[in-house]
Amino acid sequence: MVWWDDPDDAFCEDPFDPEGDYGALQVGKQPMNRYVICYDIVDDKRRLKVAKCLDSYGSRVQFSVFEVLVSKPLMTRMVRELGALINAKTDRISIYPQCATCDARRTDLGATVEKPVHEPWIIV
């Protein structure tokens, strides 16, 4: 079992959070956490597919770096989709959780990109 699938794993634990909610944003009933995802994909076609997949979950902040704001179930789905797109022998995707405390202390220099904020969808 991996960390994003473990039901007993606290989601984005932050030991400095006195409230104990670990700084997760709440959208509806789902806690949302931010991740920085970077990749090194050898093949151009696979790289484009990975970029399109990540673009559907978040915002590109560099050529091979995305920020996503997702719930735990969406994180699981995204990781499975990405895993199916890459060649594990030659490609690499790194996913870095970013707690709310760390995100609040973030510094951007130069041209910046808006932090992704996903509003809940209401389908009628």
Curated annotation (Swiss-Prot):
Record protein name field: CRISPR-associated endoribonuclease Cas2 4
CDD domains: Cas2_I_II_III
Name of the gene encoding the protein in the UniProt record: cas2-4
Enzyme Commission code: 3.1.-.-
Record-stated family: Belongs to the CRISPR-associated endoribonuclease Cas2 protein family.
Subunit organization: Homodimer, forms a heterotetramer with a Cas1 homodimer.
Lineage: Bacteria, Pseudomonadati, Pseudomonadota, Alphaproteobacteria, Rhodospirillales
Top-level taxon of the source organism: Bacteria
Gene3D superfamilies noted in UniProt: 3.30.70.240
Record keyword Transmembrane present: no
Keyword Metal-binding assigned: yes
Required co-factors: Mg(2+)
GO BP, sorted A to Z: defense response to virus; maintenance of CRISPR repeat elements
Residues noted as binding Mg(2+) in the record, renumbered to the chain: D40
Keywords: Antiviral defense, Endonuclease, Hydrolase, Magnesium, Metal-binding, Nuclease
GO molecular function, one term: RNA endonuclease activity
Biological role: CRISPR (clustered regularly interspaced short palindromic repeat), is an adaptive immune system that provides protection against mobile genetic elements (viruses, transposable elements and conjugative plasmids). CRISPR clusters contain sequences complementary to antecedent mobile elements and target invading nucleic acids. CRISPR clusters are transcribed and processed into CRISPR RNA (crRNA). Functions as a ssRNA-specific endoribonuclease. Involved in the integration of spacer DNA into the CRISPR cassette.
HAMAP family to which the protein is assigned, alphabetical: Cas2
